[in-house]
Amino acid sequence: MAKIHMVLQGKGGVGKSMIAATIAQYKAGKGQKPLCIDTDPVNATFEGYKALNVRRLNIMDGDDINTRNFDALVEMIASAEGDVIIDNGASSFVPLSHYLISNQVPALLQDMGHELVVHTVVTGGQALVDTVSGFAQLASQFPAECLFVVWLNPYWGPIEHEGKGFEQLKAYTANKGRVSAIIQIPALKEETYGRDFAEMLQDRRTFDEALADSALTIMTRQRLKIVKTQLFAQLENAAVL
């Protein structure tokens, strides 16, 4: 059974492509060859990772789903031998979610012997409320055969609202049964770990590419190695992956 990992969140610039790239690198490190697809109609960030062989497929036509291209996406999934990782843009979040649900795509994938895993992001700072409600919306609308992984991204601040952490928020407690795993992206010290990781992401480089680059200082590579270890250890513990 292949797992179809789809990164969905209606807020832009919250780390969706980073998550898709991290999953792809984790899978590759296990000797797997996931099919990576970037469907973001505006920012093809995931496609920028040359080492991951990401295919670009624009599933939007204006504000609507391009059904012919979406059909092509389903065909790609159907013929995939391993897992599939799909990065999706904020602008296509609403139409894509509606299209997946109204066309009963999660059930279709299950009938093919595949499993749909939706990865969504919750961030601290100004986007906290929007990203939490985006998660709640997905969890309440998607059918039971769909699994969820929530990534907590503290880049813009701690993930808490009125003194409550994510796991105490109503959006989570009401949908707890839907969540297979919570991945905590490390809170990185801005001037060291944070800068190193941000530069690696801006360059669309994988951890392995950065760690093999002798032009980077020894300590920069050491810090990136620690971030990689922290992320991959959590993915290792997430049974859904």
From Swiss-Prot:
Keywords: Conjugation, Plasmid. Pfam families: CbiA (PF01656). To plasmid IncP-alpha RP4 TraL. This is Protein TraL. The gene is traL.
